[in-house]
Amino acid sequence: MDARWTNAQLLIKGIRSFSPENTNIIQFPKPLTLIVGRNGAGKTTIIECLKMGSTGELPPSARSGQAFIHDPKVADATEVKAQIKLRFRNVTGKPFVVIRSFQLTQKARGKLEKKDLDSVIQSTNDKGETVSVSKKCVDINAEVPSLMGVSKAILENVVFV
């Protein structure tokens, strides 16, 4: 069995400098993808979103997620909803979508409150129907690396160093 996930696509909405009003889709063509751009363009955010989508881990500088989600003050709103979707094919070629949804709310005296709204893995069954499994039914943070054919430790310490 070939331990590689392929045909990845990342959707980012409302994370750091990515606006909650726009959906940003990044394709990762085979065999190699280079992420280049000016300072502040979002290169690191793309890597952080890949890590969050695949392992559920926040970046170290995210302050419990409050600095990871687009700031409501910048959006001129009291709350911002954010989402990361990671589409990939597992080691056997079966397509999967991991969806992680968040909310950041501006409370009294400028305090920010982050909520994880949902985490879901979607796939298609033999009848072609979409099947969803939520974080309430399975440990998504362990399941996604398994579907990708690598351990969570490899993703965290080798791929997303």
Label each region the model flagged.
Residues 158-159:
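Conserved beta-strand/loop subsegment of P-loop NTPase cores
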Residues 1-142, 146-152:
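Extreme N-terminal "head/tail" segments of very large remodeling/mechanoenzyme assemblies
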